[in-house]
Every structure is written in structure tokens, then in C-alpha cells.
Amino acid sequence: MGFEELLEQVGGFGPFQLRNVALLALPRVLLPLHFLLPIFLAAVPAHRCALPGAPANFSHQDVWLEAHLPREPDGTLSSCLRFAYPQALPNTTLGEERQSRGELEDEPATVPCSQGWEYDHSEFSSTIATESQWDLVCEQKGLNRAASTFFFAGVLVGAVAFGYLSDRFGRRRLLLVAYVSTLVLGLASAASVSYVMFAITRTLTGSALAGFTIIVMPLELEWLDVEHRTVAGVLSSTFWTGGVMLLALVGYLIRDWRWLLLAVTLPCAPGILSLWWVPESARWLLTQGHVKEAHRYLLHCARLNGRPVCEDSFSQEAVSKVAAGERVVRRPSYLDLFRTPRLRHISLCCVVVWFGVNFSYYGLSLDVSGLGLNVYQTQLLFGAVELPSKLLVYLSVRYAGRRLTQAGTLLGTALAFGTRLLVSSDMKSWSTVLAVMGKAFSEAAFTTAYLFTSELYPTVLRQTGMGLTALVGRLGGSLAPLAALLDGVWLSLPKLTYGGIALLAAGTALLLPETRQAQLPETIQDVERKSAPTSLQEEEMPMKQVQN
């Protein structure tokens, strides 16, 4: 008897599992609150050089600014430069100082803002960009973008650490570590007195939050039977969408970055308390030889699900026999993903797809400027559009297949980026429509990637394969904010980069085998039974056909 038979006896889907899904919903909601927080936390409002000495009774403010600030090529006043000396104005003497110093050339000299900046606080009372003594604008705007990169780099490192530690010490114990670490580091970030302190604490917060991404899914699915895992996975993914929309509301109500950071961090406190009711994975306990504790959790599951169990077939001795079969002989490594030709082909393609999915998703999600809506409306709309995109994925993977859905959603993302390049900056409505379409396609690509990748890898390497692709995906997420800095080279270059990477990932997805209506591979031999695809015709994995 294996673990699946044990789970069938105690109930693979019932009140016990539903309670578990509900208790693990909080981490899924917290993830987008932190991952997409830079939209509000690092927002850069309209700003200009601080210009002390403006006449208190000066009635023509715009004219006075014209004398002190140069204009950009698009006609707007510069945010980062001022004239070295005020320019002459009609009926004023503001230009006399300039003329007396011999500044008679056609192009007046300009200098950087030496006395700080003045910010428009109509939308944000404060962000890390406007923080006193930080001023992460103009020459320092790279540090503003780098804060997001540091955060996602922390997520990448944390994923590796939590993946190993949760296998070594258990899911529930490491989930507690993730909760406590996120709470402490989040509070420290909100109290940062310097940019360096903020960057360090946010990086460590990202590492702590990685525990949620690595632990919650296995802890939830390992208590579910095979039949209900897909339903539970789709249900759980809606919690992320709920967090995306909740962020818009929280950001609207709290305009100060320190209080906003506190608001998205403090829910970790009730999360810590909720762990009292979250069970450890019985499957993991059996692999570690903790038979007594696993037996206790299984009996509790049976009681909550109203399942009577036979004492003879469900004794601690019977569970011990199952444990002997569940013990891990050798832990797989990342190298196992590249040892055989077919598996190597799948791994290389999945790496490119996951990098493209994350790079384009976060590139689009973190860029809410230049649209016809304010940042709060845009974020709410971006969250709301994720719900129909999940329905699109559900229908498409059933009838068109996983491979075409993955390629099609990435192609749609690339086309949305490319079309936005053709729309002029004054066509706000069209820019908004294209951005929303791109967000829907990128979310659909993300959802498909999780399903498709898990079906490509054999059971013995599935967790390892998902770990590798998630690792590379987080690398793409960490580079996405930095790609936005390419606008200093050419204004359209960031969108061209995001779209180009998405297009490359779409083409790569077509090189993967189709898994629709195919049984999940169990061993490496199952995967290697057929050579890598050489055409774009639909292929079926060489296993028995099952109901989708």
C-alpha cells in the first residue's frame, strides 16, 4: 500500500483539505502585495529643481519657472536641470545677472539640481524616491529601480535556501520561519533611516517571502488526491489575483510608503497564529521516518473528513510499511535534468520560457505610467483582468493544448508590447487598452507555465525541474526593473526588449512536446521514450491517455 491509498482511506478531498487551503490563502495574498509593491513604494511623482528665493507675491509662477528651468525636447520643463543663471523675462530684471556675467551664447548653461527637488504630492504623500536625503530621481533613479532588483535577487536566493531547508526540516517549520522573518524584516524596512538599510532589509524580505512561494504549494497539494489537485491549484491562483486588486485599494488608502509597507507586512502576525491549525505534510513525515506524527495527522484528517478507518489496515505498523516505501534513497540534483537528451531539451526550453514569462510579466506589471488612468485605477484593472485570463487558459489548454496555449499567450504579450510602440503618447485610451491586453496575456502565460512545466517533468524530478525553472524565472523578474532604465538610451527600448524576450520565449515554447490528454511521466525513461520534437505538429507524450 502506498501513500495515495492511505490518503484515499482518510479522504483526499474534504473539510480537512478545504481548511488547509483556506489557512494557506494568506501567504498567496501577501505575495503580490510585496512583489508588486514597488508600483507605489518606488513611484516617482512629477518633480523639478528646488528654487529658493521665489518672490512671495509673484503672480506669474509659470513665467518665473520658465526663467529658471530649461525645456525638454517634448516641451515640458526639465525635472533634473536648471539654468546656471536666470533667463531674461519681459519687464523684469531677472536676466541682468546672467548678462552681467557674459552669458550671451545662444544655448544658456544648465546645471544639475544642487539644492534638492520639489515634488508633486497630489498622488503620493511620500515614496522612497521622494524621501528626504534620498531623492532617488535624475542621476539617482538607477538606485530606485535597483531596489526592486535587490528584492527579486533576494527572492532568488531565498528560493534555493527554503527549497533545501524545507526538505530537510519540514514544510510547516520553515513556513513559520518565513512568516517571522517577513514580519521582522518588513518592520525594519519601514523604519529604514538610509537607502542602504532599506535595500538590505528589502533584499532579506524577498528571501523570506520566497519561503511562501516554495512551501505553500507542496504543503497544500501533498494532502490532496490527484483528482482534486487541479481544482485546488486554480482556486489557489485566484488568491494571487485577489492580492493584486487588494494592493490597489491599500495603495489608494495609504499614500505614505512607510505606513504602506507596514500595512502589507503586519498580516504576517495572524499568519503566524494560523500555523497552529496547519498540518505538516504527512508524505514528508513518512519520507523522514516520522511515522508516529504522520499517523496522528492522518487520523485527524480522517476524523474531520468523517471517514471511518479500519484499525488493522490503518495501524501505526501499517503506516510504517508505507513509510519504508516513501523513504528517499537519493535526492535528485539539478544535474539530473541535463543528463539525458530529451530531458535536457525540455529543461533548456523551459528555462527560456520561464525567463520570458517572468521578464515580460513584471516588466508590464511594474510599468503603469503613460496610461489614461491613474496608478490606482490601473492596478485595479490589471488585477481584475487576471480573472478572465485564467478562464481563457482553462479553456485553451483543454482544447488547443498546452504548447499552443503557452506559445500563443506569450505571442499575445509580445504583440501588445510591439503595438504600444506604434501608438503615440497622446493616445492614452489606446495605450491603456493595449496594456490591459498585454497584462491578460502575460498572466495567462504565467498560469500556463505552471501547469505545462509540471506535466513535462517526470515524478522523480518534478520538484527539481520546477525549482530550476522558478529560479531562472526569478532571475528574469529581478532584471525586469533594470530594463526600464534603457529608456535613457531610447525611449521605446524597454518595451522593445520586453516584447522581444516574450517573442523568443513564444518560439521556444513551440519546441516543447504536447502533454494534453497524456498521463504524467513517472520516470526518466518515460520521458526519453520519444526523441525531441522536430516539427511543430502536435505531439502526445508517449504514455497512456487519460481524462484531461
UniProtKB/Swiss-Prot annotation:
The chain crosses the membrane at residues 21-41, 146-166, 180-200, 204-224, 234-254, 259-279, 346-366, 376-397, 404-423, 432-452, 466-486, 493-513. SUPFAM superfamilies: MFS general substrate transporter. Disulfide bonds: none annotated. GO terms for molecular function: alpha-ketoglutarate transmembrane transporter activity; organic anion transmembrane transporter activity; prostaglandin transmembrane transporter activity; sodium-independent organic anion transmembrane transporter activity; transmembrane transporter activity. Keywords: Cell membrane, Cytoplasm, Glycoprotein, Ion transport, Membrane, Transmembrane, Transmembrane helix, Transport. Glycans are attached at N91. It comes from the Eukaryota. One of its GO terms (cellular component) is basolateral plasma membrane. CDD domains: MFS_SLC22A7_OAT2. One of its GO terms (biological process) is prostaglandin transport. Pfam families: MFS_1. It catalyses: glutarate(in) = glutarate(out). Belongs to the major facilitator (TC 2.A.1) superfamily. Organic cation transporter (TC 2.A.1.19) family. NCBIfam families: 2A0119 (TIGR00898). This is Solute carrier family 22 member 7. It comes from Homo sapiens (Human).
